[in-house]
Amino acid sequence: MNTKLTVLCFLGIVTIVSCGWMSEKKVQGILDKKLPEGIIRNAAKAIVHKMAKNQFGCFANVDVKGDCKRHCKAEDKEGICHGTKCKCGVPISYL
């Protein structure tokens, strides 16, 4: 039960950071205070950092909401998600 609650709280924090309601720096500070030094803290901080960099709704090379395509329409280019970043007219080289 405790593990499930911890995971649920962490996912909530990641959501708050990715939406921009709280700064990444503030969440990183909270993680530094609450988690012991080690692999768990480093993994949690890495996940928060990656999610905070989310741009135009891109997640794991998928344009979840179509924001990347809409963003690149202004340039008359195709919007392609590269991880969590949106790039206009730049195909993914490793596919």
UniProtKB/Swiss-Prot annotation:
One of its GO terms (biological process) is defense response to bacterium. Residues 1-19 form the signal peptide. PROSITE patterns: BSPN_CSAB. It is found in: Secreted. Disulfide bonds join 58-81, 68-86, 72-88. It holds the Pfam family Scorpion_toxin_alpha-beta. One of its GO terms (molecular function) is toxin activity. GO terms for cellular component: extracellular region. Expressed by the venom gland. The keyword Disulfide bond applies. Residues 55-94 form the BetaSPN-type CS-alpha/beta domain. Keywords: Antibiotic, Antimicrobial, Cytolysis, Disulfide bond, Fungicide, Ion channel impairing toxin, Potassium channel impairing toxin, Secreted, Signal, Toxin, Voltage-gated potassium channel impairing toxin. The keyword Signal applies. It comes from the Eukaryota. Belongs to the long chain scorpion toxin family. Class 3 subfamily. This is Hge-scorpine. It comes from Hoffmannihadrurus gertschi.
